[in-house]
């Protein structure tokens, strides 16, 4: 059956909020390395609060979705996309906690590049939440997501290949742990992009 369209739904606004939380998590994690004392405590608190806020937004999204009379896409598709963005945020936050505990003075350039491209994808996902009723516009955004995802994958491969070059064993272990933590976030984000592609194929 064709899906009915409403002018706006709280569920879609919550989806945009989840994408914004992902963007904020990237911004926080990019700044967490090298923090000490009260500044480190503040950074840890902000990461924890962001994680909790994102979880609350997902619950609000689910409530709005269950109470909606009509939705622009099947409910299970919307939930899969929203929960995927939330999972990505949680993994980025976990990477931030790891970076802080690893006591890194600064993030490697590759890590900053990865975070930058994840932030770009978060912006595109927020745009996609507003385009769900326009499949042509959503497909164009999805193509940009794929390009950004491929760039992130290339950066990650270069980073992993460069690990161990001119690094002490202790620094190597720290960078490897951070790299794999961010890789987990990239895998979650890749699943979101794949799920969005499946929606586009089915609804076209």
Model feature map: region roles:
Residues 1-204:
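Cytosolic, long alpha-helical scaffolding segments
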